[in-house]
Amino acid sequence: MGKKIMLQGTASNVGKSVLVAGLCRIFKQDGYTVAPFKSQNMALNSFITKEGLEMGRAQVFQAEAAKIEPIADMNPVLLKPSGNNKSQVIVRGKVVGEMPSSKYHDYKLELVDVLKETFNSLNSRYDIVVMEGAGSNAEINLKDRDISNMGMAEIADAPVIIVGDIDRGGVFASLAGTMLLLNEDEKRRVKGVIINKFRGKKELLQDGVKMLEDIIKVPVIGVVPYTDIKIEDEDSVTTRFKKKMNKSDIHIEIIRTPHMSNFTDFNIFETQEDVSIRYVDYGESLGNPDILIIPGTKSTIDDLTYIRKSGLESQIKNLHSQGKLIFGICGGYQMLGKKLKDPYHVESEIEEVDGIGLLDTETTFEKEKTTTQVEATIVECISEYMNNLKGKKVKGYEIHMGITKRGNDVRSLDLITKKLDKEVNYTEGSVNKEGNVIGTYLHGIFDEISFTRAILNNIRKKKGLGELESKVNSFNEFKDKEYDKLADFLREHLDIEKIYEIMK
């Protein structure tokens, strides 16, 4: 069996996911085979593997850092919040059902064997498994059924490093308080702590570090400065949503709905120098974007209701009348249609609701979930926004419960040619007659830079600007370089030799 180490946190969003990714890349650089593992993840950001199984995106980018193919066993339990204190429960990549938190709390004990099996499988195949906890590891009211933090560390017999976020303040109290709430067996597992997201001069922190070590009786393995290395965030508690538009040639606005999922679909735009992004929150009005995107969502009907109540629907239609480009991904695609039907109450108690009506489509929610990777070719080129798009190859993945039928006033966007490595031939997506409203089920479609850059250059041409080439030729290559930057950065600020000593 291989070695293992587990990073746990004093709270959510302390930076565990990025640190795990960095360690995965460091160990890979040092000649080891390495895999990430997170027993339970709660997130709306998910991914579909080559086997058609669903998993959290955090373990996907960690697997990328380790230079291995992501598999669902790296995240055996995924919870996707669906509102009203309920979550869709996904085990080993497949939907088990929707459960209220009280029912899931009891169900967790049935998952212990699954966690043992999936972890042991990875641990037997890789030299090192880097494990990640979830949220705070000292939730004393949930400890008897913990499968995410110390409970999982016990299953795996893994040493633990605790991560605290100094940027939010109170890091010494949070680390010391966390240690105080652990029982003696759990304390013995903790071999060190990391102070993350530090801003300022480290010299000013040294006395505090020494005092903390005296209190908690374990070493501070590193003080990691805040960094803007472009690595995916695990959940929506992220600074990217707080960004406002900077001066740039092309402005993109994305409606941040309450159940927005897969915001990683839009990370590619941050690599394009002529693009600025603004996420539109509740109570905010749309501006004058060149592209408006309605993203994917875990609860399409609820988020459509949100768009109506917030007054955004009329603003969306106004942008359409101005000829602006409107793009819907997955749930956003469904909303842009004329009707959404839910005969089996998959989404809500409402059986039928009018859509925004900018696409001549009708969506019916089905009981079975579509989860697949696909490859496609763009087939439509019917407006100035779509010049030079015909024939472009794109890849993506689908995660949805609905089936969308096109009417006579729309055309298909793309031809699916491969599905889960099998050759197929069917059309997908919709484009209105004017060519300025586009819908697709393909998450990740913008990651194909030739496709995305063609759209951006069409907008530049429409605005009387010259074309630009992307400085990033491949999004995967760009991410790979960022993982190397992250590894170099962590080598500088963490005691990597100490981490090797800790692993067992």
Curated annotation (Swiss-Prot):
GO biological process: cobalamin biosynthetic process
UniProtKB keywords: Cobalamin biosynthesis, Glutamine amidotransferase
InterPro entries referenced in this protein's UniProt entry, alphabetically: Class_I_gatase-like (IPR029062), CobQ/CobB/MinD/ParA_Nub-bd_dom (IPR002586), CobQ_GATase1 (IPR033949), CobQ_N (IPR047045), CobQ_synth (IPR004459), GATase_3 (IPR011698), P-loop_NTPase (IPR027417)
Pfam families: CbiA, GATase_3
Active site: 330, 443
Pathways involved: Cofactor biosynthesis; adenosylcobalamin biosynthesis
GO molecular function terms attached to this record: ABC-type vitamin B12 transporter activity; catalytic activity
Domain GATase cobBQ-type per the UniProt entry, residue ranges: 249-451
PANTHER family xref list: COBYRIC ACID SYNTHASE, DETHIOBIOTIN SYNTHETASE
Entry's family note: Belongs to the CobB/CobQ family. CobQ subfamily.
HAMAP family: CobQ
Its biological purpose: Catalyzes amidations at positions B, D, E, and G on adenosylcobyrinic A,C-diamide. NH(2) groups are provided by glutamine, and one molecule of ATP is hydrogenolyzed for each amidation.
Name of this protein: Cobyric acid synthase
Organism name: Clostridioides difficile (strain 630) (Peptoclostridium difficile)
Taxon lineage: Bacteria, Bacillati, Bacillota, Clostridia, Peptostreptococcales
